[in-house]
Amino acid sequence: MSDAERRSGTSFRVLRRRDFAVFWSAALVSNTGSWMQTIAVPFVVYQMTRSTAWLGFAAFMNFIPAMIAGPFGGSYADRHSRKGILLVTQTVMMISSFTLWATWVTGVATPGLIVAIVFFSGFVAGINITTWQAFVTQLVEPDELVDAVRLNSMQFMGARAFGPAIAGIVLQAAGASTAFFLNAASFVLVLAALAFVHPRSQVFSDTGGSVLGHLRDGWRLVRSRTSLFLPILMIGVVSLLGTSVIQLAPAIAKEMFSVGRGAYGLLVAAFGIGAVTGSVMVATIADRMLRSLVANIGIVGLSLGVVALGLAPAYGVGVAAMFVMGLAYLLLATSLNTGVQARVEDEYRARVMAIYLSSLLLGVPLGSLVQGKLAEWVDLRAVIVGSGVALLGFAAYTWLRHARLRPLDESLIGPAPTAVPPVG
């Protein structure tokens, strides 16, 4: 694809690749199911315990194992077939989801048992997500990589919109058991898609040496390039202070707005709907904007959205704040993700993405755990507002310390984005 052809269209052009389109569509359905479960788990845990500390603990136990397993999965995915790894992880995650459904319908579920199942699934998910991020790039040509990354982000965020919305309806009409079952069944689509697609040949890293040695090589590469280290630092802090707030949504719905399960699903869905809106914007105009500019807009918008959520006087305002948070987060996360993908060679890709995702996955549980505990000691609104203000301070620091985030604009692959200087 020529430079002129690439700039004449949008990122949606990559859906003309049959394998990418098939995998993308199946992933959208399956991840929608996963988000249904993600919403249903804290809902039932909070329903059983009425504790924000339990909410934070459940999120912590979900994300921490993924953070631990992710780097090892990245090392393995750089040395072995990523398609084969995904076939195994998707199968195990399907079995785990059916187990969660079975414990709930048989009435043996307890908060501890639910968290234990989620904890196990988190380890597998850590290997799955790092491999997934690298595998997607094998379904397109090298000069389409950035478009594929953007569409993959759009798919994840679309699922984040549809999943909570459907979960709210399902929880209201049929209960948590149906939400758990639909998620488990959705894995069949991804397994079928994996059997169908034929990825590009993979550039394998050296299969010798230890896993820790491979991880050290990946970390040295990250530390040697500000264009890699900066987005990894940013996504970790954003997860710690920004998106971790979403894990408190059941308490926000109940304690701040006094609404039920359907409205709770809509509150979380608003974040996803905002993210879908942002992903459409990114897919259509991002080639004409610097990643640094988009990231700056995103982190400031997310910070202000978190503050607005904490100050929201009514449910409708809270929904609007979540929409803004989702839109801003998508702008930021896509810029950071594509910034990393554009600056790493294929033989290092899974390891570097594992470090990136570990930063993200560490921030969410730590933030949720601390915020959940603080919310039991002080006002929930104060905790949320404080998180937003702290994130805004971090945004100012990175803007000043790293030349308005210009390292994000560096690239090893494809044409550089057209520079659109800021007005003024």
Regions found by a protein language model. Give the residues of each.
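Alpha-helical transmembrane-bundle signature of multi-pass membrane transport and export proteins
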Residues: 1-424
